């Protein structure tokens, strides 16, 4: 069910064609934020949703991605594909010894501020990944520590520093036969997030998690390479 704000351009469907070289890249069609209703065991629940459809015409390399929705209708996302020794991983086991280095390929993000109506497009993004180590640290169903993400996105006018942790883990494993009996592998992880802190600064001031009633989000982390 659409909210009244869906008429604004920032809440309409957005399409982008991203070509890197030799015609290779990806297409993405998405709705950044919309109000939704869900029926679960006869109970009606309300929330916000993000929808996307992606078509890829290139090898799929490791990436980080995340999206946060705010109670006032604002949203923030980040995306950082990267080069890492984890491209050679052949299974879904996290926290490998080889997972010690990540060089960003590109980094982008966007923050739409519902209060001011301004949208900031970020051309820089860094993501640091660590194991949860607090007394209430969470683990997945295999007993592996869930990750904590430290994210920074910025441009010349504004910046956001975000600290979030995963509360559970869903994953999909892809094994693609290729040439000479070689099998390429990709593990795609998805994590519902708990926001620990967020600090956003621009020319109009600063905001943090205490300025919002709630912030909910989701993150992706993929490793391996699918070709």
Please provide the spans of the model-predicted regions.
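Structured soluble/peripheral alpha/beta segments that form catalytic or ligand/cofactor-binding pockets
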Residues: 4-227
């Amino acid at each position: 069910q659409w909210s009244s704000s869906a008429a604004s351009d920032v809440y309409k469907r957005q399409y982008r064609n991203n070509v890197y070289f030799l015609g290779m890249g990806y297409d993405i069609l998405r709705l950044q934020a919309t109000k939704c209703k869900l029926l679960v065991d006869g109970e009606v629940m309300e929330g916000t949703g993000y929808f996307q459809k992606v078509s890829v015409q290139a090898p799929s390399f490791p990436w980080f991605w995340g999206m946060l929705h705010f109670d006032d209708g604002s949203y923030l996302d980040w995306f950082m594909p990267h080069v890492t020794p984890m491209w050679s991983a052949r299974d879904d086991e996290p926290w490998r010894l080889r997972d010690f280095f990540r060089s960003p390929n590109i980094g982008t993000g966007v923050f739409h501020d519902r209060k001011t109506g301004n949208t900031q497009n970020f051309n820089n993004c860094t993501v640091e990944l660590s194991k949860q180590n607090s007394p209430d640290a969470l683990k997945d169903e295999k007993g592996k520590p869930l990750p904590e993400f430290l994210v920074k996105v910025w441009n010349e006018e504004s910046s956001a520093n975000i600290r979030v942790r995963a509360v559970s883990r869903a994953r999909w494993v892809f094994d693609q036969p290729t040439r000479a009996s070689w099998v390429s592998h990709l593990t795609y992880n998805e994590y519902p997030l708990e926001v620990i802190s967020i600090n956003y600064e621009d020319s109009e001031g600063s905001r943090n998690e205490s300025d919002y009633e709630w912030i909910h989000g989701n993150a992706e982390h993929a490793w391996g390479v699918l070709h």
